Amino acid sequence: MLICKVLKPLVSTNRIPGFEHKHLQVVLDGSSNKVAVDAVGCKPGDWVICVGSSAAREAAGSKSYPSDLTIVGIIDHWDPDSPKQIEV
């Protein structure tokens, strides 16, 4: 799992069959931008939990879905500059 920050929505209307019309978000993973399927309805500025690989496909709705990164949760409290995080 990854912790990422949602930067902005990504709109793609011309897609391959099977890609459906799920919402896409541009997320920041450290210093690189990635595209993730939004399975939870997040918005720019949210810190989110993302999964990759086969977990991303299942979280997007199907093992055959062509995704390698899916947002599966919105983090309620996260300070990336804090030296220690509270475990819940």
Swiss-Prot record:
SUPFAM superfamilies in the record, alphabetically? EutN/CcmL-like
TM region positions: none
Subcellular location per the Swiss-Prot or TrEMBL entry: Carboxysome
Q: Name one Pfam family in it.
A: EutN_CcmL
Q: Could you list this entry's UniProt keywords, alphabetically sorted.
A: Bacterial microcompartment, Carbon dioxide fixation, Carboxysome, Photosynthesis
Q: Name one GO biological process term.
A: carbon fixation
Gene3D superfamilies listed in its UniProt record: EutN/Ccml
Which Cys pairs does UniProt list as disulfide-bonded? Answer: none
Q: Name one GO cellular component term.
A: carboxysome
CDD domains according to UniProt: EutN_CcmL
- Please report the stretch or stretches of sequence annotated as the BMV domain: 1-76
What does the protein in this record do? Answer: Probably forms vertices in the carboxysome, a polyhedral inclusion where RuBisCO (ribulose bisphosphate carboxylase, cbbL-cbbS) is sequestered. Has been modeled to induce curvature upon insertion into an otherwise flat hexagonal layer of major carboxysome subunits. Has not been identified in purified carboxysomes; it is expected to be present in very low amounts.
Q: Let me see what the UniProt entry remarks about domains.
A: The tight homopentamer forms a pore with an opening of about 3.5 Angstroms in diameter which is positively charged.
Task: Fill in the subunit field for this protein.
Answer: Homopentamer.
Instruction: Name the family the entry cites.
Output: Belongs to the CcmL/EutN family. CsoS4 subfamily.
What protein name is recorded for this chain? Carboxysome shell vertex protein CsoS4A
What is the species of this protein? Prochlorococcus marinus subsp. pastoris (strain CCMP1986 / NIES-2087 / MED4)
